[in-house]
Amino acid sequence: MYPLFRFAKEMIKFRNAPRLAVTGTHVSTHVCWPWDLDPWIELNNGRTLTLFDLGRIPMAQRSGLIPILRDRRWGITIAGSSVRYRRRIRAFERFTMMSRVAGWDHRFIYMDQSMCKGAECCNQVLIRSAITSAGGIVPPAQVMAALGAAPDSPPLPDWIAAWSQADALRPWPPQLAPDAKAHLPA
């Protein structure tokens, strides 16, 4: 189930926070509740991705993106992600989430998010998102202009650029093995 009450709490908590630069870092604090756990009594890996919404969407609100999406009838979608899990977050532990836009290219905006306990990073996700309209993907330079920001991205870190290039090599739609195809409806 989506954490609607926690999402509402975050949006209310940061509704009057100072405006955030497009590449500024949004910092928020959270608790791992029992309903976030997997059978090993730690934060579930899928739930981790859901909880990252609690940082990413308030970050978008603080940067001024959400009102622009509404006014222009644009949407935002996740076009890819890469996650690293390194340390456990257990029941009732507090953690700090950092969310920032790392940069953009001609199609996508790249967001870097981390969850930390103290100074130790527990996990990190790289999110590639697209702003969409009825006509398709809105170029990020156009989105930045709407935000009053420079249309040119800061240089993408090498690891993000390499991930994007590697992902472009991935076949789509996926090439299914013959035994997998046998289970698809005709």
Residue ranges of each PLM-predicted region?
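HotDog/MaoC-like acyl-thioester-processing domains
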Residues: 1-16, 89-186
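Short coil/loop residues immediately preceding or within conserved phosphate-binding loops
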Residues: 27, 78-80, 96, 110
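Short N-terminal edge-element motif at the start of the domain
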Residues: 68-75, 91-93
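Active-site helix/loop of acyl-thioester processing domains in fatty-acid/polyketide metabolism
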Residues: 47-70
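Short amphipathic
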Residues: 23-34
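A conserved, well-ordered hydrophobic junction motif at loop->secondary-structure transitions
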Residues: 39-51, 181-185
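Short structured motifs
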Residues: 14, 79-85
